[in-house]
Amino acid sequence: MTSLLFAFSLFLSFSVGSIFPFSISNGPAVNDTLQNAIRSQRDVSKPIPIDRVGFSGVSLSLFFESEGYSSDSLSNLNGLLKENVDGVMIDLYWNEFTSKWQLCPAPFPNNITYTTASNRIVDVSWNNKTYKCDPNLSTDNIMSILNSFIRDTNTDVEANFMHVMYNLKSIHYEKSNQTISLENIYKEKNSNLNVVGMDTLNDTVSLLSSYIFTPTLLKQYQSTSNKYTNSSSSIRYIDSLNETQAIQDFYSQSTILMPSLQTVLLTQYKRLMVHVVTNDMAESSRSYQISSSDKDTIFFNSDLPASIFHTDNASADELCYELSDAYNGTDVNIAEFNKVSLNATLRLVVDDDKTPFTTKSLSKYVRCGYCPIFNSTEYSSQKVTEGNSSIISREFASNLFWSWAPGQPSGPDNCINCTRPTTNNTSKHSDDNGEEEEEGNNIAYKCVALTEEGWEVSNCYEKYLFACQNKLSRNEWKLNNSTKRNYFDIDDDDCPEGYFFSLPRSNIEMLSLMTTVKQENVNYPIWIDLNDITVENCFVSGGPYAQCPYQETVTTDKFVRMIAPSFVVAMVVLVLIFIEKVFRKTPIQTNRKRYWKKAIHEYYAKNDYEGVPS
């Protein structure tokens, strides 16, 4: 019986484990290298204003237009969110017939019928185009996916900052005698018909309200920051500034004062912003009127401007060329870089079927300050499932980072294009008598160097040039071509006065450093202040003794899934033990007691002595 109990409990542990897996996933598992790259770039960018932290996004129109406007078309979204896609662009239509926001570009006739209860897809036409739409589809379908992803990644280690971007459009008609027939077709007449849609813009994101960084929160931050600045009468000297203060001081000169990623993501615990990036609603008496409630939740261009560029024209390339060539024989044009760094705006570049992104063009856009939005329908040709990543991930994963080179961060064993050691691995240290001794053949692939392709994990004992950054001007760098150090020997005193050993924390800072390399005509690799010496794959700045800020954490949902299998198995085992104790009969033991009782009775009957035996 005991062995039977053990076998049954073992079976339960496997079966329950399949019911309550440790990690429920509707998309592909993200490989370790990609996950480390995502987290480390995010960590490096923590002091940077949130509007200048780069991200990549996807336009949902590419799924809807190729697969129809239904919830099934959103099946790839969760997988894309796990693959470093942090933005979702949505075309949102104001239906002037029903006065509701909807995702389908065409109005639904009021006499609409469905073929089956499970299949509610109907063909609807508008402006000489026909669409396949589900009348039940609404923004709640999108927001529930985002909400689930946010809940599953709501830890300091996994949390990322996201963007929901709206393109507002109208299902518009001109009021005239000829349009009475249209109103008879499309205006709601049957009160029993459940017209799906949202009454206000604010309603479209209500499922995510607790996670949204709003214009109201921005105003509170700006008010507090201005009071602090105005009340501070002390003069900060360059030497007394730490890096965080230096970054704050530089970006406080921005056109709009925005909080840092650290403040919003890890202090206020907000996970996303909602923007109206374009407003193409028709002017009409039936048009939607933006309310104060909408303005309290959603960013419009008056709060934070958005600039949208398209790959089918050269306007997006102009800024990239200007920054890449912003130098001459004597110095780098720092003013050009500062103009971009201090301009608070959302810079988006959107591709299409005629001019889709290439690996080369994508890397260029990301490095010069654009946030790419994938909009070509070729990206929707394959389902994203467990073990089957998206086309975006397979072809462009390495190009979505302004920081890391392709295949990084990775050690030399797994690296494809790593820069190999070219110098003698020799460093000097002092013994107990103060005499210098040479120490050779040291290998520690724990430090990060800048190469022409981006950041690479390199041997800390290699002697390279090192990047010195101006404390008060984030895009100004110095590279001493005559001084090379291994990573452990670099000190701030090795940099010119007013500079310190540092690293780029944004795409524009990265591009300004790479432009300085070209201007000063020095060779890669170049050390930057980043390493994972103390904890593997936890990349930190601050020298070789900088500590990893993370502990092993799990979300509440994951914790429940972790303990659920053990809890269920334990309860079943306890129930079985209880049943055994209460209902099990042991006839062998019962017979044994009866036999010995009879034997003893017969013995005393035959040997019945009187008195005390002698």
Swiss-Prot record:
InterPro entries: Telomere_Capping_Maintenance
Parts of the chain on the Extracellular side: 18-558
Keywords per UniProt: Glycoprotein, Membrane, Signal, Transmembrane, Transmembrane helix
Pfam family, one: TIM-barrel_MTC6
Presence of the UniProt keyword Ribosomal protein in the record: no
GO cellular component, one term: membrane
Signal sequence, start to end: 1-17
Cytoplasmic side: 580-614
UniProt subcellular location: Membrane
Transmembrane segments: 559-579
Membrane topology: Single-pass type I membrane protein
Keyword Signal appears in the UniProt entry: yes
Glycosylation sites: 31, 111, 128, 136, 177, 202, 230, 242, 313, 328, 343, 375, 388, 417, 424-425, 480-481
Similarity comment text for this entry: Belongs to the MTC6 family.
Function, in words: May be involved in telomere capping.
Protein name (Swiss-Prot/TrEMBL): Maintenance of telomere capping protein 6
Organism this protein belongs to: Candida albicans (strain SC5314 / ATCC MYA-2876) (Yeast)
